[in-house]
Amino acid sequence: MSKFVKLHLVRTLNKYKELQKIRVKDVMISGDVIITTPEKTIKEIFDEMIKHNISGMPVVDDRGVMIGFITLREIRKYMTSHPYLNVGEVMLKNPPYTTADEDIITAFEKMIESNKKLDQLPVINTKYPEKILGKLEGIIFMEDIIKLLYENIIKELKTLVSFYNHNTEIKIKY
């Protein structure tokens, strides 16, 4: 294995370790999370999702405790035949979630591995004692994690190209 390949592998591993240090709380949205309640109809929520261009939202009780998650996927199953069903009847009752202190790589893996094909994860406080899920603290979008990963990959590629250019006769432009 060449010195260049070894260096690249070491740098990639180190970069992965660096990204694991980034916490969900550093990337999540916490103030303006669009939520719903279990009493609303799927028609109301469908209209709200279209208005805000989102594909899902946390379902919370009157104390802000997350009790489920509703996605366009669930809504579409019932929209034409039962538009006035309550969200609580069709929501995901045990959705994947993350916590503010979890690393972004783990949160990203949860989104990818979810059989619900989520592009966002609710961020909850699991120390909330009364419910299985916990109090909603925010939401993290796959798009934001991908942007962060992309920025880090570009930085790493520029570093590698610079290193390669300094150690070879051939110059690579980026």
UniProtKB/Swiss-Prot annotation:
Signal peptide stretch:
none
Q: Name one Pfam family in it.
A: CBS
Provide the record's note on post-translational modification: Methylated at an undetermined residue between Ser-2 and Asp-26.
CDD domains for the chain:
CBS_pair_SF
Q: Which residues form a coiled coil?
A: none
Q: Which UniProt keywords apply?
A: CBS domain, Methylation, Repeat
InterPro entries cross-referenced by the UniProt entry: CBS_dom (IPR000644), CBS_dom_sf (IPR046342), Diverse_CBS-Domain (IPR051257)
- The CBS domain covers 28-87, 91-156
Q: What is the superkingdom listed in this entry's lineage?
A: Archaea
Here the disulfide bonds are none
Q: Which PANTHER family match?
A: CBS DOMAIN-CONTAINING PROTEIN, CBS DOMAIN-CONTAINING PROTEIN CBSX3, MITOCHONDRIAL
Name recorded for this polypeptide = Methylated protein MJ0556
Organism equals Methanocaldococcus jannaschii (strain ATCC 43067 / DSM 2661 / JAL-1 / JCM 10045 / NBRC 100440) (Methanococcus jannaschii)
